[in-house]
Curated annotation (Swiss-Prot):
Superkingdom of the organism of origin: Bacteria
Gene3D superfamilies registered for this protein in UniProt: P-loop containing nucleotide triphosphate hydrolases
Group of enzyme by EC: transferase
BP term (GO), one: nucleobase-containing small molecule interconversion
Entry's Gene Ontology cellular component terms: cytosol
Entry EC number(s): 2.7.4.25
Family to which the UniProt record says this protein belongs: Belongs to the cytidylate kinase family. Type 1 subfamily.
Listed name of the protein: Cytidylate kinase
Residues engaged in binding ATP: 10-18
Catalytic activity annotation: CMP + ATP = CDP + ADP; dCMP + ATP = dCDP + ADP
Length: 226
């Protein structure tokens, strides 16, 4: 059986990237973290003091800089023009600004075109906010992950602790709620479950349990990949 495309969508900190990395490794597929692309543009904008509300300068960043990936043992390394930014794009200032950048229609056009180029050959696990609806609408398997705000804030809190980033739990909850609102209400490619996506609530589930649930969906659709 040929390689398929797997789209995993969901709100911030719902577990998308973690399970997508594991699935890609299990299947020997390419893993594409589309959120990292928007984070990279956001990072460039902040570094160059570009107004994140101004669309044209952001589009220029997309056109004039090259975002690339390298597969790594624990997922994926991210580069801008050959310089690694894997950790830099996960800092709080980028996290809090990325929704404002990704709402711009022309920025999304540039990013979606690049993402579709990566995914056109199949054999890819791609995660983001609009993969099943806009980027890979014909993906054979579409998953929509959700989790409670409290659980997602707890995950982000632990991630920040491990990175030595001091954050307040209630502040994280407020930030996640704000991102949910921005992502789901933007005019271009809002966060929405594709009509043919399978919804999985990851609240209270381990990573292994979520991966197993997705494996079951794949098998139920007739793809014996494992």
């Amino acid at each position: 059986m040929g390689k398929i495309s797997i789209a995993i969508d969901g709100p911030a900190s719902s577990g998308k990237s973690t399970v997508a990395k594991i699935l890609a490794k299990q299947l020997n597929y390419v893993y594409c973290d589309t959120g990292a692309m928007y984070r990279a543009i956001t990072y460039l904008a902040l570094q160059n003091q570009i107004d994140i509300q101004a669309e044209e300068p952001l589009v220029a960043l997309c056109v004039n800089h090259t975002i690339s990936f390298q597969q790594a043992e624990n997922g994926q390394r991210v580069f801008i023009d050959g310089h690694e930014v894997t950790e830099a794009i996960r800092q709080p200032d980028v996290t809090n600004a990325v929704s404002a950048v990704s709402k711009h229609a022309k920025v999304r056009e540039e990013m979606v075109a690049l993402q579709q180029k990566i995914g056109q050959a199949g054999g890819v696990v791609m995660d983001g906010r609009d993969i099943g609806t806009a980027v890979l609408p014909k993906a054979e398997v579409k998953i929509f992950l959700v989790a409670s705000v409290e659980e997602r804030a707890e995950r982000r809190f632990k991630e920040n602790q491990e990175k030595g980033i001091e954050t307040d739990f209630e502040t994280l909850k407020a930030e996640i709620e704000r991102r949910d609102y921005l992502d789901s209400t933007r005019e271009v490619s809002p966060l929405v479950q594709a009509s043919d996506a399978v919804k999985i609530d990851t609240t209270g589930l381990t990573i292994e349990e979520v991966v197993a649930a997705i494996q079951n969906v794949i098998k139920q659709k007739g793809f014996e990949l494992f």
